[in-house]
Amino acid sequence: MRIALTGNPNSGKTTMYNALTGRNEKIGNWAGVTVDKKEYPVKKDHYDGSLELIAVDLPGAYSMSPFTSEESITSGYVKNEHPDAIINIVDATNLSRSLFFTTQLLELGVPVVVALNKSDINEKKGNKIDEKTLSEKLGCPVIKTTSTTDTGLREVVKKAAELQGAGQKPPYVQGDINLHDKKEVEAADRKRFEFVNAIVKQVETRKVLTKEKNAGDKIDAVLTNPVSGIITVSYTHLRAHETCA
């Protein structure tokens, strides 16, 4: 059984892959289309069931749109190689930004488990995420994890193994759009961002910072704003597509 590990850059994805497999892969995003995917059996420390589990470390990506080399590798593997399950590593400290990608993965028909990673850091900041409600809204399991301490890894792997062959109803379906039409892409991204942000408002409680926002919050505010987020993500995708054309 092959389990694809997906997530935004710097979500802790490769740290989780190393923990699950005992490997020591370089932590960082893949560079260039010539780099092959990484895959290795999951250690018995994290799974003692009857299945042979192979973890596949895919490049960090913000979207399933294949406009960058990293996104192309990730999108191509999930769509063409048909992994048995996906562990989507979501950065708990940047929930809105991460869930844009999550909702795209849930449209593909492959069972998804969300690993709500860096939960320890998020809680130290005074923030809270209701993972039970988030699971209900997404229609998939959500498990808190901390890759650096192995917290939650056995649970997330066990759940992924249990989901083999299971069906999941996607919470959001975009439909076909013309990727060459900037206005159409922006409109589609706007709707997805609005859907994601509506979920986040229901499940996340953030500690109010009285003096200034930290750098991550500032970036998150730009990327998940219904207007600026569209400009940032869509423009980057379109420019990358034009360059490759």
Give names to the regions the model predicted:
Residues M1-V56:
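Conserved G1/Walker A P-loop phosphate-binding module
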Residues L53-P66:
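Switch II (G3) loop of P-loop NTPases
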Residues Y77-E81, A85-C140:
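Conserved C-terminal guanine-recognition region of P-loop GTPase G domains, centered on the G4
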Residues E123-K169:
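Canonical P-loop GTPase G-domain recognition
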Residues G167-V200:
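Short, non-transmembrane cytosolic segments of multipass membrane proteins
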Residues V203-G216:
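Short, membrane-interfacial amphipathic segments enriched in basic
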Residues V222-P226, I230:
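Loop-to-transmembrane-helix entry motif
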Residues H237-A245:
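Single conserved hydrophobic/aromatic residue that forms the stacking wall/gate
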